[in-house]
């Protein structure tokens, strides 16, 4: 349980402190999502419940699709602007 909390906090801190780089922001979001998935998986194993384990697999599949869509948007953003840096005005 504490490992998932540490991973989630690392994801939040990475998202907050790397506001200029889109790739690091996507990685931070994935770390947060996978830490929650790990928490669900550990809880379902401790409770001997198969539904939590299937839900964790479902979350991992959705996270993979999310990563693919995010990277496709990133490629389109790079082609449009020539950079992946975010500029706040």
Curated annotation (Swiss-Prot):
BP GO terms, sorted: ATP synthesis coupled electron transport
Residue stretches spanning the membrane: 1-21, 22-42, 57-77
Record GO cellular component, one term: mitochondrial membrane
Database matches in InterPro entries: NADH_UbQ_OxRdtase_chain4L/K, NUOK/Mnh_C1-like
EC number(s) on file: 7.1.1.2
Principal location listed in the UniProt entry: mitochondrion
Keywords, alphabetical: Electron transport, Membrane, Mitochondrion, NAD, Respiratory chain, Translocase, Transmembrane, Transmembrane helix, Transport, Ubiquinone
Superkingdom of origin: Eukaryota
Catalytic activity, reaction form: a ubiquinone + NADH + 5 H(+)(in) = a ubiquinol + NAD(+) + 4 H(+)(out)
Its job: Core subunit of the mitochondrial membrane respiratory chain NADH dehydrogenase (Complex I) that is believed to belong to the minimal assembly required for catalysis. Complex I functions in the transfer of electrons from NADH to the respiratory chain. The immediate electron acceptor for the enzyme is believed to be ubiquinone.
Stated family: Belongs to the complex I subunit 4L family.
Name assigned to this protein: NADH-ubiquinone oxidoreductase chain 4L
Naturally occurring in which organism (per UniProt): Hypocrea jecorina (Trichoderma reesei)
